[in-house]
Amino acid sequence: ALSVVSNVVEDTWVDRLGVNTKDHLWLVVISLSAAIVVAIPLGVAAAKFARFGQVILAAVGIVQTVPSLALLVFMIPLLGIGGPPAIVALFLYSLLPIVRNTYSGLNDVSSGLQESAIALGLPPGARLRLVELPMASRSILSGIKTAAVINVGTATLAALIGGGGYGQPIFTGIRLDDMGLILEGAVPSAVLALLVQGMFDVADRVFVSRGLRLTIEASRTSRRLRWFWSPIRRWR
């Protein structure tokens, strides 16, 4: 008689953590990168073309109102089960914060700076590249940070459609009533969200100069004061 000896090596929680972290980061990085490439031009178009801008903001706003689980389910008939539908859903969820912050950041650029750029003879493309986008950079970075943190949390639902990530141990733990498995996914997901937020806070201080931050805040304060005082002046 033949005896078959099988050596079964169980994965440790460290091994599972490594695999889940890789899958989770893959979902977040791919979807966020695609959203940045698409959303910033959409935000610029929304700021430059008023009528078209309202359509863009309304469209990305509607996507954001769809529940995340429903959006993932809608992707299954189109893309099947696994990573691709999860990436597309996360990509769509990432659009609104980046588009909105790009739009508001460009609108917050003071008219004085724009007039100075025009006086220097800069064409529209150069004004956008050299003046307006640098002034809006802090707002755009804030939108990307918001989208990244949202993605880290929402990506846990990708496990429901076979996307992997930290949601895998969470939902397995719920089915088995195993708190250890639930924490195996919940704790790293929370830590990753905090790390992402901290990383973007550091990037804000490194890539946005202190003088530019002060200029942006002064520009926003000036716009708010004009908005506050204009009705009072008309009433007088």
Positions of predicted regions on the chain:
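Membrane-embedded alpha-helices of multi-pass transport/permease systems
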Residues: 37-42, 56, 85-114, 144-152, ...
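Cytoplasmic-entry segments and transmembrane alpha-helices of multi-pass inner-membrane transporters
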Residues: 19, 26, 42-75, 90, ...
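Loop-to-helix entry region at the N-terminal start of transmembrane alpha-helices
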Residues: 16-28, 76-97, 137, 181, ...
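Periplasmic/extracellular loop-to-transmembrane helix junction in inner-membrane transport proteins
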Residues: 1-33
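Short cytoplasmic-facing helical segments at TM-TM junctions of multi-pass membrane proteins
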Residues: 101-146, 170
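Glycine-rich helix-loop "coupling/hinge" segments at transmembrane-helix boundaries
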Residues: 77, 154-189, 208, 212-217
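Transmembrane alpha-helices
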Residues: 29, 92, 125-158, 180-184, ...
